[in-house]
Amino acid sequence: MPVDDCWLYFPASRGRTFVQTVWVAPTCPNCCWFPGFLPPVPRPPHVPRVLLRGPRGAVLPASRPSKTLPSSSQTPCPTDPCICPPPSTPDSRQEKNTQSELPNKKGQLQKLPTMNGSKDPPGSYDFDLIIIGGGSGGLAAAKEAAKFDKKVLVLDFVTPTPLGTRWGLGGTCVNVGCIPKKLMHQAALLGQALKDSRNYGWKVEDTVKHDWEKMTESVQSHIGSLNWGYRVALREKKVVYENAYGRFIGPHRIVATNNKGKEKIYSAERFLIATGERPRYLGIPGDKEYCISSDDLFSLPYCPGKTLVVGASYVALECAGFLAGIGLDVTVMVRSILLRGFDQDMANKIGEHMEEHGIKFIRQFVPTKIEQIEAGTPGRLRVTAQSTNSEETIEGEFNTVLLAVGRDSCTRTIGLETVGVKINEKTGKIPVTDEEQTNVPYIYAIGDILEGKLELTPVAIQAGRLLAQRLYGGSNVKCDYDNVPTTVFTPLEYGCCGLSEEKAVEKFGEENIEVYHSFFWPLEWTVPSRDNNKCYAKIICNLKDDERVVGFHVLGPNAGEVTQGFAAALKCGLTKQQLDSTIGIHPVCAEIFTTLSVTKRSGGDILQSGCUG
């Protein structure tokens, strides 16, 4: 009689072979040889020689054997003498791996271990793939896996913020990240454009008011359409979606709990963790009671008024930028440096530009207490803060306090310890291989929760798609985490790709890099006569490698649009000579990169007198 379906590994096959039915053939007591299929393979202790029947009844390698194999049909081992080691005796087996260590009795079926220690054969799972997290990466992986006719389940559940904010399918980027942030950044740019328009002949009233409620209504309407579109796309691709919280309860098993507390248990051959991150709180009196995070800001039903932004991350500076851009009084409280992890030359220029445009900075202070002075929408709050390098304390009153001090991975409450997935105990990040595989072979992870990887939506999408193609499409293409472009949507946008100046010095040595740089003045800004010599371009070249460009940085309008094309060039090995030989498009901001000639080392003048230098 056949045993359960399982996976069996044969070293000589350079891969894995699916065993749908296993038949005992006790001819050679020492090896797993069967005619015409593989060379002799040493047999693990107490695992009998087998003949295999593949999927849909296909016999490996010849015709399907009968359930009782007569001795005349048994083929002796082709090696003479047999090269396989004798099996261990029952007394020598150890306590662990009990599924594979039953006594070997000739002519009797033995229980073989299935992949990853599960008692379930792959064919008996509810799904081929269960994805925990319905963000950009998880959805990309789900839709890609469905192309290969795999049965996929997506579990997505939003734990409400302390203020009760929640949202629909799509994850951080769509609901409380990239999409609403960029739209509100656009609202601020339009405010500046209205001011500039007077110099272009438009008659605009001196007082132009911004309507917060109208903006959030429009933004949330667009987000709602995206949420619906994702659900429709999953349904069309026959991906099962449940609004439920997923938690591992054992190997290949998960419990899904919906918002009413109803639980369902599902099993899958593989799992993908794509749970993302949530904003971090300070752990001080009043932070969760009275403060908001970026998870709350984009759907806030009232104008936040005078706002204190706590933090120096890109989230903090982007939010401070568009809030100031729509006319609000904004202060940023910074513990140490701006934009940690980014090029500090560029970060400081961003800070200077924001200060010149009315955003106040309180540096080297951290909040210690938040108190409510007056309830309301927005109400009034008192903030007490402590200096990071002295005993000085300060107080200030604000209508809204926005916390943007970092984000924590959503990995600590999904039962990873139950199945043995290792995480960084300090950060909650998950270490993975270059194929996004955790230390548990059937569990994978992508996105912001990965240790040492970029926390960017396009990275998660790319990793999710490529993972599904490798698992189900026979691909061997891996996600390339090098030279990934990104943009910080501050009032003066910052686009970059490759190494920061600090990282380049660390990697190659200061004497082995050359930095070419220049200020520039967008033509559109010359007529309203604003922000001359504030936009800035910089490339970092490796002198030991034909001046190959290893870092690209730009401050200016539409920085993301400028950076995207250069990112492709960097991946192709762009050199300074190739940039110099490229004819620029005139008059646009990006052409500055075709004319860079002054190096930082030289100390030459980089100020520009007009759009054409």
Swiss-Prot record:
Disulfide bonds: C173-C178
PTM (free text): ISGylated.
N6-succinyllysine: residues bearing it: K182
A GO biological process held by the record: gastrulation
Start and end residues of each stretch annotated as Disordered: 58-121
Cross-link (Cysteinyl-selenocysteine (Cys-Sec)) at residue(s): C611-U612
Enzyme class: oxidoreductase
Gene3D superfamilies from the UniProt entry: 3.30.390.30, FAD/NAD(P)-binding domain
Molecular functions (GO terms): FAD binding; identical protein binding; NADPH peroxidase activity; thioredoxin-disulfide reductase (NADPH) activity
Polar residues biased stretches: 65-74
Binding site for FAD: 136-137, 156-157, 172-173, 177-181, 245-246, 275, 314, 448, 455-457, 586
Catalytic reaction(s) noted: [thioredoxin]-dithiol + NADP(+) = [thioredoxin]-disulfide + NADPH + H(+); H2O2 + NADPH + H(+) = NADP(+) + 2 H2O
Function field: Reduces disulfideprotein thioredoxin (Trx) to its dithiol-containing form. Homodimeric flavoprotein involved in the regulation of cellular redox reactions, growth and differentiation. Contains a selenocysteine residue at the C-terminal active site that is essential for catalysis. Also has reductase activity on hydrogen peroxide (H2O2).
Name listed for the protein in its UniProt record: Thioredoxin reductase 1, cytoplasmic
Organism annotation: Mus musculus (Mouse)
